[in-house]
Amino acid sequence: MSQTPIKKEESNDQDDKFEFKKYINEGKLPLKADNPKKKPQLGTIQANQPIPSIFDNLFNLFKVINTTYTFLYLRNSLTITFPLLNSSVKQSLKKELTIGDLSQLREICPQIIELNYKSLASLALEINKNVYTDLNPELYTGSTVSQSSEYVLVIELLETQERSSKRRRREGPTMKANIQRQKLDFNNLKKAIELRNQKFLQGIKEYIKKCQLTELDPTQQLLTQSRKNQPVPPDSPSIPNDSIENCNLNTKACSIEELLNEIASESSYEGQIVQEALHTYPAVEAQYGALSRPLSQELINALYTSRNIEKTYKHQADAINHLWNGFHVIVSTSTSSGKSLIYQIPILQSLLEDNQSTAFFVFPTKSLAQDQKKSLIDILSYMPTLKNIRVDTFDGDTPLESRESIIRSANIIFTNPDMLHQTILPNANRWYYFFKNLKLFVLDEAHVYNGIFGVHVAFVLRRMRRIAEYFGNSQYRFVSCSATIEDPLQHMKKIFGVDNIKLINYTSSPSGSKKFVMWNPPYVDPKHPDDGKKSAISEASKLLIKFAEKRVRTIVFCRVRKTCESLMRLVRQELKTKQKGDLLSKIQSYRAGYTVQERRKIESEMFNGKLYGIIATNALELGIDIGSLDAVITIGFPYSLSNLRQQFGRAGRRNKSSLAVYIVETFPVDQFYLKHPILIHTQPNAELTLDLTNEVLLASHLQCAAYELPINIRSDEKFFGNQIQDICEANLEMVEESYRPHPKYLPFPASQVRIRSVSEDMFTLVDVTNDKNVILELLEPFRVALTAYEGAVYVYQGKTFIIRLLNINKRIITAHQVDVEWSTLQRDFTDVDPVRSLMKKTMHGSTNIYFGAVKATLHVFGYFKVNKQKDILDVVDITDHPVEIDSRGFWIDVPWHIIEVLSLKKINGAASIHAAQHALLSLMPIFISNSGNDIRTECKAGEKEYKEAKSERRRPSRLIFYDNCGDSSGAGLCNKAYEHTDELITMAIERIESCDCKVREGCPGCITSSKFEGGVCSGEVLDKVGALILLKMLLCQHVNLDIYADGPEIDSYHALRTLIPSC
């Protein structure tokens, strides 16, 4: 790996360095004699009242620090430390700077000043040595700091650079603006300093006024509060008691209403609660129902002793009665409505009547299976008659030596669809007695079985039904439980292929009241709306900390892993800054990728009340019991209303009042529900998608079925449909009037058919800090390429690690824990190329649209080091290890004359294609149910598209999309989108034309999407106007080029230099 730092632009003005040092030493702004400017004064704060001298002294101190900071940071991106500032203050004010001084400055204006201790090891990683040649190195390394400390205080001034950074990003593509830091002229430096001085002066005025209104002495209040909140190094041997804010960890949790009232009354509250969206679900009383058959007294006693259950709710009783009457049952009710009893009671009663009875309990995740197994065993422990009944887990973690014993003697098996597919069905003869005595087959969380995974599971269950019938058993019953979904009856019919089903879609269990709050982040600066809004992550961090302080047990849902870890990191930083160390161990993150042991530990701590908060992805949407929760915070819309409602249902699971907070983001779907909040409660859920006509997937499962039992067309058509004969003739081998697997699938077809889009070639991430060698998590190759390259800053449980080594052959990644304030962004591009066309259609004249086999290749060739303002601190090259995906997709070859038209307008052709692709992608969920990144496109890299030298990466003028899940046969999603290309393009044109944004890079309302937040695409190379022209011309619509401004390219050559004709 080679490191290439950004070269700093050198000044030709020999006096520049002299002036720079002069102002650093004096802490002054040079003011021209012919244009004097009046310096800010404090005397106008309040008439007839003297200003305490401490504030006047602090204002002078701030001006010196501000001048020093601005020159150092904006010129060289230095990390500004306490020793560095102390040197300047001593020279200018002839006094020593103290940490108490800085704490007082922060107390007056916390929105500008941030103080954090950082380890010397992390600072060493940030130092770009070549920019310190003219400075005393002791100023940075801190020889004045106690040699016993491993930490140094870092100062950051936030207000001015935050807005200017955002403005720079809006002026043009990120790479054009930031690939090399432009030299700031002297006037810009003066403006930055003056603006911050004015902000601090205003902060003093507001601080004194607030104290006067509350009849507090401003000086005494400042001294008390700044001493209380003074930053302390993490390795300090002792922390003064008065410096740690009381977190009220031993007090009773406040009520939801008290919590909301307190939030709204705080000075930091900026009207984030959307009043017209407030909604309260009233408390509901229980309704009970009677079972049609009496339960044994032993089971009645066990239910009462283990769960305090004396009678069944009406929906439970109705479902159980349907099962006893010979029907299959689908239960689609709200979260925490007691669905598990619907299958637990019948199987326990059946075992009392016939101890040879068996049952499969199938769950989508191992953690959910273990949770439900524990619940069932708890009831069984009070039933002595069933003491010999064996309940076991049969999954990938089950030891090989234990499996035969489980097959022979288990009555109830907890498993997952993967084990059914890969182990149980291919070895069906060993399971003869289990299938023969099967009474109940439970498929929990049915809403999970959607899209490509749902199709796979549907075919697996048809294979299971075929085996059971072969062994002479067709009397067992299916029970499927689900969150509230649209048309659950039809969904169960598709999953199981059966008809005699009864639907239970009403809830009769009691529930506490639930308050729904929509939280709209405020503008960074209300006077400058173009600067955008405060991030949803920072708003969530403040809310979560507030809830935890009040002992309100909370779960925060994030769409992607990156958001989950970013939030956890921010929470840890804020808790350290605020000296609330008691809460650090009370909040944890939870997501896929963590080891099983780590997740079980977090689940247990939450269940036992040891945690006040969990930050999670949708891994905790499912019904894992983590105890009683008081509140849910959802960051951004989670792909579907069903997901959103499922997340809201996690709070109030013990009949308590609860709170659901939805923090809206700037993406189109969030803004839609912000304008129409009532639809969150009234709009029907989107239908789940199961495309059982996918002949490629069916053919692969027929290979597996033929291995389990030879296929007979006449008898097996009822399981697999009337297309079975054609598929068998084309893909399987005829042997003695029945079909057997094709030889290429032998010796074991199931091993070649993966039902989940999870790679078997996982990488192991290992923490090697202090030689501890602890496994952190397992990562898929695609995720490794994007987040775990050598040198990357990787976030785990809110802690930052540097990736030290990526061993491709051994699939091992080593990481070292460090405390850094910067992060890394990969420099990457993806090539997506057609391999073979399977279908073709013509759209409006001569434009062809193709569907077929594609290959996607991800290249990560380096990374940027960036600070919190997204300024690039360093550029690093790394060795590229391409990741390839074979899939299915569709593409549109853009005629070259369209690209030439764009070039005449000096509009970048690659940016236009990229913007058009994302405009279409953002609309596909209207026609296809998918989980965010199931369909992807070829993304452009700003570093490649905008560099001045001739680009070696010239791509065809083509819009292309591919299935990112499934195997080489795809997931069927692009096939469906291919059928709607005309509608998609028409809708994209309407969306772009109706969007009010004025920037060429577009906004979340037209051409950008939530895909950018997870690091899948940087969103650098976009041109909204070019996308509109391109899409219109594809539909042969008239385009008046005169109404569109020319693009940013210098000439027509530069506008198309990275493209070649697609055909």
From Swiss-Prot:
ATP binds at residues 333-340. CDD domains: DEXHc_Hrq1-like, SF2_C_Hrq. One of its GO terms (cellular component) is nucleus. Disruption phenotype: Leads to hypersensitivity to DNA interstrand cross-linking (ICL) agents mitomycin C (MMC) and cisplatin, in response to both chronic and acute exposures. It catalyses: Couples ATP hydrolysis with the unwinding of duplex DNA by translocating in the 3'-5' direction; ATP + H2O = ADP + phosphate + H(+). GO terms for molecular function: 3'-5' DNA helicase activity; ATP binding; ATP hydrolysis activity; bubble DNA binding. Disulfide bonds: none annotated. Residues 320-503 form the Helicase ATP-binding domain. Its cofactor is Mg(2+). InterPro entries: CDT1_Gemini-bd-like, DEAD/DEAH_box_helicase_dom, Helicase_ATP-bd, Helicase_C-like, HRQ1_WHD, MZB, P-loop_NTPase, WH_DNA-bd_sf. This is ATP-dependent helicase hrq1. It comes from Schizosaccharomyces pombe (strain 972 / ATCC 24843).
